[in-house]
Swiss-Prot record:
<dbReference type="Pfam" id="PF00886">
    <property type="entry name" value="Ribosomal_S16"/>
</dbReference>
<dbReference type="GO" id="GO:0005737">
    <property type="term" value="C:cytoplasm"/>
</dbReference>
<comment type="similarity">
    <text>Belongs to the bacterial ribosomal protein bS16 family.</text>
</comment>
<keyword id="KW-0689">Ribosomal protein</keyword>
<protein>
    <recommendedName>
        <fullName>Small ribosomal subunit protein bS16</fullName>
    </recommendedName>
</protein>
<dbReference type="GO" id="GO:0003735">
    <property type="term" value="F:structural constituent of ribosome"/>
</dbReference>
<dbReference type="GO" id="GO:0015935">
    <property type="term" value="C:small ribosomal subunit"/>
</dbReference>
<keyword id="KW-0687">Ribonucleoprotein</keyword>
<dbReference type="InterPro" id="IPR023803">
    <property type="entry name" value="Ribosomal_bS16_dom_sf"/>
</dbReference>
<dbReference type="GO" id="GO:0006412">
    <property type="term" value="P:translation"/>
</dbReference>
<dbReference type="InterPro" id="IPR000307">
    <property type="entry name" value="Ribosomal_bS16"/>
</dbReference>
Amino acid sequence: MAVKIRLKRMGSKKAPFYRVVVADSRFPRDGRFIEEIGTYNPIAQPAQVNIKEDKALEWMKKGAKPSDTVRSLFSNAGLMEKLHNEKNGK
């Protein structure tokens, strides 16, 4: 089972709102997921990002791969650096 951390689109037409979810890569984008670990609202100025850091780190340590967009959100939040430091024992 290839697990991905990706965005699930919510909201209405022309007003997107996303949930950051952990899902099997074979499931549809807005379909079934394993766990919700955050939200992303690109419409708000500045964009609102809420991520459960402990859950995100836990899933990435288990091998879940973030999508490109989620990876960028995690980098801006400092999560990728935390993961790198934990893996290298700093």
